[in-house]
Amino acid sequence: MAKRQLNRRQNWRIEKIQGERAARAAKRESSAVEALEGGDLGPEQTGLVIAHFGVQVEVEALEGELAGSVSRCHLRANLPALVTGDKVVWRAGNQGIGVIVAQLPRTTELRRPDSRGQLKPVAANVDMIVIVFAPLPEPHANLIDRYLVAAEHAGIRPLLLLNKFDLIDEQNAPALNALLAVYRTLGYPVLEVSAHHGNGMEQLQQQLDGRISVFVGQSGVGKSSLVNSLLPEVDTRVGPLSELSGQGTHTTTTARLFHFPGGGELIDSPGIREFGLGHVSRSDVEAGFIEFNDLIGTCRFRDCKHDREPGCALLKALEDGRVQQQRMNSYRSIIASLPESSY
């Protein structure tokens, strides 16, 4: 059944109610912080945000007597929005509730637009973005390329991970092999694993060790199953594929950070079906297609749109086979999705 469209007044009323609720929650949180700071708080120490729950976060102590322990913390009102992976300065309270007093600088930040088009960080200090896809639901190069552009734009190393490779058969093998060949030719690291059978999981663990990684990909590709295989002691609920859409049902409800025994961390985030790139410019997208690097700026016309213009270096490379048609299609699709202000 089609979703009911809301008129302007209904949208305004919903936003007004949500704003009032947020204001009341912020006031309650401010009162709680004041009460804590009025009592006995421990010394300032560094911590790592491992989960976010509305106006509170879970912080793992990184030093001192509490090192390794986890505390629920309030946030001071003057702090920016925190996300999983943030390093912070916090103070412990007497009753297991602490207060975050400062955010430490981020080395990297993974952001995406929310439902209103506003940029929101989803993970911080990430070293590697693992782009997960599977034979089912059918992988789309355009979505993979959007993740790659986001990774290049954020300065985060990407890893392409084909999960459920045991589901490859005579029907889907040609398309999957062709898809993987494109990225291997470009030099992107590609792994094929099966979280269900365990194949390739040791090689994946080697890639994850020593890094802070985040798994991204549409629902149903097995991100939660991968976490369960890598960290058997963690109970991440797994939802079945929808019989109607072939896409997975959302299971993980909040980004959470897990430690691997051999070193390194994983941030498991909710499935993302469409990764928006409204915050990037045309030049950012061009830079995200690494095979374009030596071609951009060599077209006959400075304002070349790489469409049908004579003397276009990208079109010549496409004709020569140095640029794959699949990648050019993705590039054009991403460019077409950008707001005009990004041009």
From Swiss-Prot:
Q: What Enzyme Commission number(s) apply to this enzyme?
A: 3.6.1.-
Subunit info?
Monomer. Associates with 30S ribosomal subunit, binds 16S rRNA.
Its chief place of residence is cytoplasm
What the protein does? One of several proteins that assist in the late maturation steps of the functional core of the 30S ribosomal subunit. Helps release RbfA from mature subunits. May play a role in the assembly of ribosomal proteins into the subunit. Circularly permuted GTPase that catalyzes slow GTP hydrolysis, GTPase activity is stimulated by the 30S ribosomal subunit.
- CC terms in the record's Gene Ontology section: cytoplasm
The record describes how the cofactor is bound as:
Binds 1 zinc ion per subunit.
Stored PANTHER family: SMALL RIBOSOMAL SUBUNIT BIOGENESIS GTPASE RSGA (PTHR32120), SMALL RIBOSOMAL SUBUNIT BIOGENESIS GTPASE RSGA 1, MITOCHONDRIAL-RELATED (PTHR32120:SF11)
| Signal peptide range | none
| SUPFAM superfamilies cross-referenced by the UniProt entry | P-loop containing nucleoside triphosphate hydrolases
Q: Which gene encodes it?
A: rsgA
Tell me the compartments it is located in: Cytoplasm
Which BP terms in the Gene Ontology apply to this protein? ribosomal small subunit biogenesis
* GO MF annotation terms: GTP binding; GTPase activity; metal ion binding; rRNA binding
First-tier enzyme category under EC: hydrolase
Protein name according to UniProt: Small ribosomal subunit biogenesis GTPase RsgA
Residues forming the CP-type G domain are 116-275
Transmembrane spans: none
What Pfam families does the entry give?
Answer: RsgA_GTPase (PF03193)
Essential cofactor(s)? Zn(2+)
Name the species this protein comes from: Pseudomonas fluorescens (strain SBW25)
Family indicated by similarity: Belongs to the TRAFAC class YlqF/YawG GTPase family. RsgA subfamily.
